A protein has these predicted regions:
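Residues forming the flavin
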Residues: 2-380, 384-427
Length: 428
């Protein structure tokens, strides 16, 4: 495969697939890079029992003339190129234009017991289940916030799990107000109705959240605070997720400007998805959480603009703006309860990679100082879990990103040619 592409797309989810297809249709030499073994991203992850959704298979079949670079993880940035970790070793891939379709990750908030075996993210357990992790007959509690809880519970039931309940932190009045607005997006209303129908018989509680998980070698029971008081449920698995956070590490390393919705950054783009860095575009969740429809539309737009076809991108703006309004509606109605930010006690592990408790982080004003003193954020996830949680808790924001973006071989790290000054990573 070549080491230079006219258009290089990072991320093979819905946005990346649309971007790669569109750019290739304009005659560009396109590379589509993703860390996973198959295209589709998190939302279109292959299900060992049911395959990928039809929309995903159709999108993948359209990748004519696109080099799909599976199992390729970005390590660092070079001059108009990315240093990646590939199955055969490290390689540098140059580009004329770069489209960031890096998606999002689940927001996990710490509470006592959240590191027990059997406690996962809601989306995380959904992904594990699709990959074949056995859940048949398991008693599962699903909790957190947003429509992802329903999708996760639906997948779990299809794979034979006994879903004991779905516990949504947003109050009932807010969720009902959101549901009434779905009439403006009929397709989403139909999708929501289908989910509720398939989940008939599963309790769906509002204004409720996990206070604590208990267990010896694994989770055994969970305390849930609800408007009616505290209740305890015995369970085998606990899946808790509080929505999504954009993946911006690569964009920050490239020097792209960021915008903020609350404590979490997303890539700042103009109407045609151009970032502050010449030749770099951002599509989908990287530019702010918007959902599947936004990702597909913005991916197509980025593919048009990156190949010099801005008129075609302009034609998609009305649809994109409509879907972005849905994302804003979702953010407003599922805003997090302030009580969720004070669940962790002094002994709660915040950085599970390096076993750092909340009390060990007292007195630090920035992430860099905390990292130097405690190793918080220096594990395999590179602060994606603990750093994001700490930003949500108001401890210190994540500003900047360091190489490696993902774990890499020592030989790869030794060969890095671009290491910006330490000032570029203050706060990371």
């Amino acid at each position: 495969m070549p080491d230079r592409y006219d258009v290089l797309v990072v991320g093979a989810g819905p946005a990346g697939l649309a971007a790669a297809h569109t750019a290739a249709a304009h005659g560009a030499r396109v590379g589509l890079l993703d860390a996973q073994p198959r295209p589709g991203g998190q939302v279109w992850r292959h299900d060992v029992r049911r395959q990928a959704p039809r929309a995903a298979r159709d999108a993948i079949e359209k990748l004519h003339g696109v080099d799909v670079l599976a199992n390729h993880s970005v390590v660092s940035v070079e001059s108009s190129a990315l240093r990646v970790e590939a199955p055969q070793g490290s390689r540098s891939i140059a580009y004329g234009s770069l489209i960031l379709a890096t998606g999002a990750r689940e927001l996990l908030l710490p509470f006592p017991g959240w590191t027990l075996p059997g406690v996962t993210g809601a989306g995380g357990l959904q992904a594990l289940t699709k990959q074949g992790w056995p859940v048949t007959g398991k008693r599962v509690v699903v909790a957190g916030s947003g429509p992802l809880l329903l999708a996760a519970a639906d997948t779990l039931r299809k794979h034979g799990a006994n879903v004991l309940g779905i516990f949504e932190q947003a109050p009932a009045t807010t969720v009902r107000a959101f549901a009434r607005q779905l009439r403006h997006w009929p397709a989403r209303a139909v999708q929501a109705a289908g989910l509720r129908l398939r989940l008939a018989g599963v309790p769906y509680r509002f204004g409720s959240f996990v206070r604590r998980a208990h267990g010896e070698d694994a989770v055994q029971r969970v305390d849930i605070e609800s408007p009616g008081g505290m209740q305890t449920l015995e369970c085998d698995l606990l899946a808790v997720g509080y929505g999504l956070v954009p993946n911006t590490e690569l964009a920050q390393m490239l020097g792209c400007a960021m915008d903020y919705l609350g404590p979490h950054p997303h890539v700042s783009v103009d109407r045609l998805l151009r970032t502050s860095v010449e030749g770099v575009y951002a599509a989908g969740e990287a530019g702010g959480i918007g959902g599947l429809a936004v990702a597909r539309l913005e991916g197509a737009m980025a593919g048009h603009v990156a190949t010099g076809h801005s008129v075609a991108a302009h034609a998609l703006l009305p649809q994109r703006d409509r879907e972005r309004r849905f994302g804003a509606l979702l953010s407003r109605h599922f805003a997090l309860d302030a009580r969720l930010r004070s669940l962790a006690d002094n002994d709660t592990l915040i950085c599970r990679c390096e076993d750092v408790t909340l009390s060990e982080l007292d007195g630090f004003t920035d992430a860099r100082a905390a990292k130097l003193a405690t190793r918080c954020g220096m594990g395999a996830c590179q602060g994606r879990i603990c750093g994001t949680a700490l930003a949500e808790l108001g401890r210190f924001p994540r500003n900047g990103a360091r190489p490696p973006i993902f774990p890499a071989r020592l030989a790869t790290l030794a060969g890095l040619t671009t290491l910006p000054s330490d000032d570029a990573y203050r706060g990371s």
